[in-house]
Amino acid sequence: MPGVTKMQCLLFRLVLITFVFLDSVDDVNAGITSRYTGKEWPAVDIPLDHEVFAVPEGHNAPQQVWFFCFPLVAVAEYVTKNRVHITQGNYDGNAVIISWVTFGEPGFSEVQYGTSDKNYEFTAEGKMTNYTFYEYSSGYIHHVLLDDLKFDTKYYYKIGDGDSAREFWFQTPPMIGPDVPYKFGIIGDLGQTYNSLSTLEHYMESGAQSVLFLGDLSYADRYQYNDVGNHEIEYMPYMNEVVPFKSFLYRYPTPHLASMSSSPMWYAIRRASAHIIVLSNYSPFVKYTPQYLWLNEELENVDRENTPWLIVLMHVPMYSSNEEHFMEGESMRAVFEEWFVNHKVDVIFAGHVHAYERSYRISNIRYDVSSGERYPAPDESAPIYITVGDGGNSEGLAGRFRYPQPNYSAFREASYGHSTLEIMNRTHAFYHWNRNDEGKKVPTDSFVLHNQYWPSNVQESKLRKHNLSVLGRIASE
């Protein structure tokens, strides 16, 4: 080829081969169990006097637990040193809830904000709350809703006044649309160890615009968009603590009312081209319970024309070949799996198991004792199940996988890390699992995710157009 060097030709072939491999990875039948053993910190909590917990200068400076909530904005220093977190505040993403904690004095639940740095055109007031847990006192927790925001716009905001004032910024997501590109990060079972810090530092290099947490933010029970996990339950009657999920409910607001949910434990949001559903394994979900009825209606309301990517978050995996917590998600699978297949859910993320694992597209909805079909079977309409419970918890990694590796398991490894899902358009997204490896983010499991709805929808549309064309010709004869 004139004007093209041999090196360029080789590079093109390499890229093409790589794409063909990634594009066909869903069809591979041989699962992989990685034997990799990387460096890791001891699974112990970071001491409270560590610099990541240092209070910023200034009297009564706002602060918050540095394990933030969905979505992630700004830069690493913002996350690790200022402890203010935000979460989506409504159904479509043009509202945010800003949360922080003050100690000593309650201060004011007020946020000044605008689209120019240090020029705050608007003021929003929120509410302050606090709670106790045995001998622990939470401090003063502030939640302020900023709504009617412009899409795809950078906002600057200020919390506090005088010496205690702190200034930050966030970026609102693009307007909802079928071909809006967007990059999500996924982290589960983060905890507050040195491995947790390593995961966050690696994650900050990923370029993700928002982070989806899969539960177990803290392990203080021995003390998220955000999903609740078993370590948030905190039901301890021997300490006269009988309100489950107390800390979670006080600290991490969710926009559950916007999706007509009766509980902050399960809810849905739309962001860019994705419709994200968050479920609770630790709330009732069987037939006729509030969560069951809500999910049934929410799935019917999903608009795949505008949000083609349907993503479900939960804490306990429905499919896992790890010895730890084996089959714990079976009850929820038995109740909801058929719905997920019928509605062509693209991917389901879970945590709980402190390792990484990805499945093929499989389902077990044909299970019948009399038929002998006891095991999951390939199902093109089923979601891919991904366990990302390797954020850095204090309990260590779950390295005992079951053997032989089940046919439904595509890749599994017991290492700390995080994932990213980069939506490109209505039909394709790129997925990466990144292992924490010697100070670098290392992609180790990657594939192209094909949208479940649009390929069949396009075929049906072409068929309808063809039939109408044929009918038109017949009518004209």
Q: What kind of feature is each model-predicted range?
A:
Residues 1-16:
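Classical eukaryotic N-terminal signal peptides for Sec-dependent ER targeting/secretion
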Residues 31-36, 48, 67, 75-398, ...:
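Metal-dependent phosphoester/phosphodiester hydrolase catalytic core
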Residues 35, 41, 45-50, 57, ...:
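Intrinsically disordered, low-complexity cytosolic loops and termini enriched
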Residues 2, 17-42, 67-73:
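N-terminal signal peptide
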Residues 3-6, 27, 156, 463:
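Generic N-terminal leader/processing signal
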